[in-house]
């Protein structure tokens, strides 16, 4: 259900991105030439890049937010932003260019798009669980009654956010110093790539179809559930 809710949050951006991608690649040569020469194609490509290339961002925010809303956490939006911060912390911040030069201090769109989707799903659930647990255990800073609600919510989220970021920093350090990689790269190589091989097989397609049909039979939106899980893998 949480994955289905996340799909609903994410799909609006993907539909808009798809529309602009279609405009940039209209199968009419005369129109396509005008779009390309006028610079409209570059604008459409930028819109596409800012939607499809940020799918992992939308995913981690959507899953964390849906998890916390399901647990009736009032400061769910703060938890969702914490999930985003955790995701950025655990993904590569450098990239080697074709020239061999290494660029640091960046957020690579390679990892905010398809490559980072499984990592985003895992982080979304992990952050949602820890944040919700902190709220249930009343691990927060309480402010006096006269303090504005916005300020009080910020302080009440301080300890859960600090705990989550500290845990993610430890995970980052373990991956960096022991495995010489990042958490996102580790997940991609250990989980996502092998799963791609399974889902590309004949039996994988059969299993996906059966599971989707069973979900529909029980009254659950099989397309949203299976799509939310399988589209990142594919």
Where do the protein language model's features map onto the residues?
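Central hydrophobic cores of alpha-helical transmembrane segments
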Residues: 78-87, 227-232
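Structural signature of hydrophobic alpha-helical transmembrane segments
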Residues: 46-55, 119-129, 201
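Generic multipass alpha-helical transmembrane bundles of integral membrane proteins
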Residues: 163-234
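Intrinsically disordered, low-complexity non-transmembrane regions of multi-pass membrane transporters
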Residues: 1, 139-151
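Hydrophobic core segments of alpha-helical transmembrane domains in multi-pass membrane transport
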Residues: 12-25, 58-66, 83-94, 121-132, ...
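Short, small-residue-biased leader/transition segments that mark boundaries at the very start
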Residues: 2-9
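Inter-helical loop and helix-membrane interface segments of multi-pass membrane transporters/permeases
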Residues: 24-48, 85-115, 144-149, 181-197
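Membrane helical hairpin/interfacial module
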Residues: 40-64, 68-83
């Amino acid at each position: 259900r949480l994955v289905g809710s996340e799909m609903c949050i994410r799909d609006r951006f993907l539909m808009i991105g798809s529309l602009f991608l279609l405009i940039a690649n209209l199968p009419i040569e005369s129109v396509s030439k005008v779009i390309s020469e006028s610079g409209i194609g570059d604008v459409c490509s930028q819109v596409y890049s800012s939607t499809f290339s940020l799918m992992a961002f939308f995913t981690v925010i959507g899953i964390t937010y849906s998890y916390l809303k399901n647990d009736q956490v009032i400061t769910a939006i703060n938890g969702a932003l914490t999930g985003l911060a955790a995701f950025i912390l655990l993904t590569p911040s450098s990239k080697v260019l074709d020239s061999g030069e290494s660029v640091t201090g960046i957020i690579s769109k390679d990892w905010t798009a398809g490559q980072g989707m499984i990592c985003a799903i895992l982080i979304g659930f992990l952050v949602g669980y820890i944040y919700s647990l902190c709220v249930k255990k009343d691990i927060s800073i309480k402010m006096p009654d006269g303090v504005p609600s916005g300020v009080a919510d910020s302080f009440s989220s301080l300890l859960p956010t600090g705990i989550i970021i500290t845990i993610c920093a430890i995970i980052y350090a373990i991956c960096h110093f022991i495995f010489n990689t990042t958490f996102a790269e580790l997940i991609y190589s250990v989980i996502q790539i092998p799963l791609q091989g399974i889902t590309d097989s004949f039996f994988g397609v059969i299993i996906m179809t059966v599971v989707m049909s069973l979900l529909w039979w029980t009254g659950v939106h099989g397309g949203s559930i299976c799509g939310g899980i399988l589209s990142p893998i594919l």
